[in-house]
Curated annotation (Swiss-Prot):
Comp. bias intervals (Basic residues): 101-127
Alphabetical list of Gene3D superfamilies matching this protein: 1.10.8.50, 30s ribosomal protein s13, domain 2
InterPro entries reported for this sequence: Rbsml_uS13_C, Ribosomal_uS13, Ribosomal_uS13-like_H2TH, Ribosomal_uS13_bac-type, Ribosomal_uS13_CS
Stretches the record annotates as Disordered: 97-127
HAMAP family referenced in this protein's UniProt entry, alphabetically: Ribosomal_uS13 (MF_01315)
A GO cellular-component term linked to this record: small ribosomal subunit
A molecular-function term among this protein's GO annotations: tRNA binding
Alphabetized UniProt keyword annotations: Ribonucleoprotein, Ribosomal protein, RNA-binding, rRNA-binding, tRNA-binding
Protein name according to UniProt: Small ribosomal subunit protein uS13
Functional description taken from the UniProt entry: Located at the top of the head of the 30S subunit, it contacts several helices of the 16S rRNA. In the 70S ribosome it contacts the 23S rRNA (bridge B1a) and protein L5 of the 50S subunit (bridge B1b), connecting the 2 subunits; these bridges are implicated in subunit movement. Contacts the tRNAs in the A and P-sites.
GO BP: any one term: translation
Length: 127
């Protein structure tokens, strides 16, 4: 397995697909990286030479913010929103959808599993 940006890249996959295993690199950015390095996107990772792997590693580390740095950057931005007390920050703090989605129904992913609420007790049957 090739190791790029602290991630083990799967050997059997095409390079274009394998690069997307790195947080911060999607399909379009993977294609862009391969074009700039001149590596064939249809090659399997196991077919890459050491020179090509080091070329990919240098390209990614120099030009892109990936993995831990990117996660840290995102967390800092969310923390900043919470600190200034804007609506987006409050929604993050409360664990609710941030981008204006409805919450009367749906929003289960963001709000978590359903909480069981006790129903009204039925009136005792008259005898």
């Amino acid at each position: 397995m090739a190791r790029i940006a602290g991630v083990d890249i799967p050997r059997e996959k095409r390079v274009e697909i394998a690069l997307t295993y790195i947080f911060g690199i999607g399909p379009s950015r993977a294609t862009q990286i391969l074009l700039s390095t001149g590596i064939n996107p249809n090659l399997r990772v196991r077919e890459l030479t050491d020179v090509q792997v080091s070329l990919l590693r240098e390209e990614i580390e120099q030009k892109y913010q990936v993995e831990g740095d990117l996660r840290r950057f995102e967390n800092i931005n969310i923390k900043r929103l919470m600190d200034i007390g804007c609506l987006r920050g409050r929604r993050h703090r409360l664990g609710l959808p941030v981008r204006g989605q409805r919450t009367r129904t749906n929003a289960r992913t963001r709000r978590g599993g359903r909480k069981t609420v006790a129903g009204k007790k039925k009136a005792a049957a008259k005898k």
